[in-house]
Amino acid sequence: MIKDRAIQYFMSGYSCSECIVQACIDEGICDECLLPCATTFSGGMSSGCSCGSVTGSQMILGYLFGRANKFGNKISAREKAAEFVEEFKKRNKVTCCRILSAGFSGSERKNHCVKFVSDACEILEEMMKVKV
């Protein structure tokens, strides 16, 4: 289960995007080369925009369902990405890091944002259950 691992990584210092990618690496879902890419996706793409939990999850969806679809089916990565955002917004209203993080910093921010990491992992895990 990636959620528990991702939360562990997040609380130990990984960023929101990194913790999701690292948990997926640990589970054999994606290649370790994605972790350095995830670094700049945190903090709203380093600019306060899209939540790193969302963008880290999008990286995994792209890896699995992109041009070289790992499942060998015709599921569209872009459709999966749109579904992910829709579900995340149902749970949290927005995907904007600035709004979600509510001005918190340091350990307060970690404690506040862990919910978004958890939500993203739950959504991602559900979306990875596909029919081949």
Regions found by a protein language model. Give the residues of each.
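Active-site-proximal helix-loop elements at catalytic-domain edges
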Residues: 1-27
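Short glycine/serine- and small hydrophobic-enriched flexible loop segments
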Residues: 22-26, 59-66, 122-126
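Short cysteine clusters
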Residues: 16, 51, 97
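Phosphate-handling active-site elements
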Residues: 27-37, 63-80
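Acidic-glycine-rich active-site phosphate/pyrophosphate-binding loop
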Residues: 22-40, 91-98
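Glycine/charged-rich beta-loop-alpha catalytic/anionic-binding loops adjacent to active sites
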Residues: 1-5, 35-43, 99-102
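Glycine/serine-rich anion-binding loops at beta->alpha junctions
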Residues: 40-63
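C-terminal binding/interaction regions
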Residues: 76-132
